[in-house]
């Protein structure tokens, strides 16, 4: 994972998907 859980929700996708 290159992003934090919160970051994923703010538009850090598709990092955490």
Swiss-Prot record:
Cellular component aspect of the GO annotation: extracellular region
Major location (coarse): secreted
Gene Ontology MF terms: toxin activity
Domain of life according to the entry: Eukaryota
Disulfide bond annotation, renumbered to this chain: 2-16, 3-12, 8-15
Cell location: Secreted
Tissue expression pattern: Expressed by the venom duct.
Keywords for this protein: Disulfide bond, Neurotoxin, Secreted, Toxin
Free-text domain note: The cysteine framework is III (CC-C-C-CC).
Family: Belongs to the conotoxin M superfamily.
Main function: May act as a neurotoxin. Has no activity on mollusks (tested on the freshwater snail C.retropictus).
Protein name (Swiss-Prot/TrEMBL): Conotoxin Pn3a
Organism whose genome encodes this protein: Conus pennaceus
Organism classification: Eukaryota, Metazoa, Spiralia, Lophotrochozoa, Mollusca
């Amino acid at each position: 994972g290159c992003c934090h859980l919160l970051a994923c929700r703010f538009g850090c996708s598709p990092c955490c998907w």
